[in-house]
């Protein structure tokens, strides 16, 4: 990965310079990355982009050309710029595994590092993880709507730039898509690629039939034909059937057809009848054309004959929910070996962070269904031989007690004392992990509209800490 050290908001660097001038830059602090609302109006968010975050951290450095540029801004002391010359990340980063399902206000990534290091990485960390998590979650919803039909990512040409196209394709496959049309993403991440022909192929020939015959001649064993250039039912499908019969007579198996416009439900049903009558009942009928999870769900409920889906613009841009509002907040500062918790208060209760150095534990019932998450201080333990009572962090009278349960701590080390502990996994393996994670959720949390809210509670110790800090801040204001 290229050096992205200067991929940051300008205010980070003057803060670093200020910390340096005040000689507090080496103070050890704890930051949490979390989000306040799920991606894509979903009941959950799939964490994605961890491998790229690790690459970013591993490549942090200030080469001479960067230092020269920073000097030209006339914002930084020469002493500070000399200090940056030897920059190396030396802290700890703990994160949930890539593909883990998470929920609002839970620490997704926790950084414990010298202040200047922890502050510098905020912007890049957020842009990497926010975007890929958004697209992975959107892809998961689209695939859920498809009810097991294969979904292909077709969005590169509509992505908001090359990086969004490349890393969006990665995230989409992690979220459940079977393949991408993005060749570079296929090469970079070793993920399946798909594609056949555009309307321009059909238009270039004197007739639609001639174009189909030419394509079948070149790709007799990978022949999927685009049938909506002129007239799906009166031209496209009949011509495709002629070509398919010829392929079959010569020992080849055609793949199917794609419809990219029109009334997809009606056209697919009628096309299916024609294919069945011609003896091609097992062929794929792929639909594209501005699809998303809601359109696919409506088509499936209408008994369409589509059995694979190419989803582009509304997936790669997450069109109806185009950002994940992940944030990165100071949670604690060390004074020697003592942890001093930090809290940000706000008139908006949603923006009051959970203080301290924390971890997240997931609680499962005996059927291995996720029942609740518990945010705890990092040194707390749970005795699973005893009943566990959790309560809503705001409506504290709402309690749930678990008796026959198991737990899993969600965070794993990415870096310890600057040493990388992360082990890369194949994308398809991460995709399977996502499916395993989703299988632990009740269907109510996966509804496309109005999903049930998953329980995320605070331990008694953390709740007491937060309440006391809020009380102290209120007293200070008086």
Predicted regions and their residues:
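Glycine-rich phosphate/ribose-binding loops and adjacent secondary-structure elements
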Residues: 200-371
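Ordered alpha/beta subdomains of enzyme catalytic regions
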Residues: 1-221, 248, 253, 329-478
């Amino acid at each position: 990965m290229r050096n992205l050290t200067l991929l940051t908001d300008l205010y980070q660097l003057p803060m670093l310079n200020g910390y340096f001038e005040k000689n507090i830059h080496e103070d050890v602090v704890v930051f949490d990355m979390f989000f306040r609302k799920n991606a894509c109006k979903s009941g959950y968010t799939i964490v994605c982009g961890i491998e790229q975050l690790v690459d970013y951290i591993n490549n942090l450095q200030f080469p001479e050309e960067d230092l020269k540029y920073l000097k030209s801004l006339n914002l930084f002391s020469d002493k500070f710029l000399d200090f940056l010359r030897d920059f190396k990340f030396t802290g700890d980063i703990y994160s949930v595994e890539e593909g883990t399902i998470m929920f609002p206000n839970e620490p997704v990534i926790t950084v414990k590092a010298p202040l200047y290091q922890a502050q510098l990485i905020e912007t890049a960390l957020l842009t990497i993880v926010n975007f890929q998590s958004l697209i992975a979650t959107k892809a998961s919803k689209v695939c859920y709507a498809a009810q097991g039909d294969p979904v292909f990512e077709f969005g590169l040409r509509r992505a908001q730039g090359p990086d969004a196209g490349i890393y969006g394709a990665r995230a989409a496959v992690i979220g459940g898509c079977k393949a991408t049309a993005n060749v570079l993403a296929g090469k970079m991440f070793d993920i399946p690629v798909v594609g056949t022909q555009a309307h321009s192929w059909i238009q270039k020939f004197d007739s639609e039939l001639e174009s189909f015959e030419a394509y079948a001649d070149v790709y007799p064993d990978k022949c999927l034909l685009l049938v909506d250039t002129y007239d799906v039912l009166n031209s496209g499908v009949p011509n495709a059937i002629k070509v398919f019969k010829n392929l079959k007579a010569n020992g080849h198996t055609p793949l199917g057809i794609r419809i990219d416009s029109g009334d997809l439900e009606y056209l697919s049903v009628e096309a299916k009848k024609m294919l069945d009558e011609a003896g091609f009942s097992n062929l794929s009928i792929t639909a594209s054309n501005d699809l998303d999870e809601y359109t696919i769900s409506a088509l499936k409920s209408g008994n369409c004959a589509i059995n694979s889906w190419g989803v582009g613009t509304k997936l790669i841009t997450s069109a109806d929910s185009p950002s994940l509002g992940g944030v990165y907040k100071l949670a604690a500062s060390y004074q020697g070996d003592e942890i001093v918790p930090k809290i940000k208060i706000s008139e908006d209760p949603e923006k009051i962070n959970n203080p301290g150095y924390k971890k997240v534990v997931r609680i499962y019932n005996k059927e291995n269904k996720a029942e609740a998450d518990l945010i705890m201080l990092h040194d707390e333990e749970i005795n699973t031989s005893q009943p566990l009572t959790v309560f809503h962090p705001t409506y504290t009278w709402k309690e749930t007690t678990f008796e026959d349960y198991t737990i899993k701590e969600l965070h794993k080390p990415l870096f310890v004392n600057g040493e990388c502990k992360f082990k890369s996994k194949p994308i398809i393996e991460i995709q399977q992990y996502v499916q395993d994670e989703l299988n632990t959720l009740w269907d109510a949390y996966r509804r496309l509209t109005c999903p049930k809210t998953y329980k995320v509670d605070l331990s008694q110790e953390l709740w007491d800490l937060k309440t006391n800090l809020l009380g102290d801040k209120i007293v200070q204001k008086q």
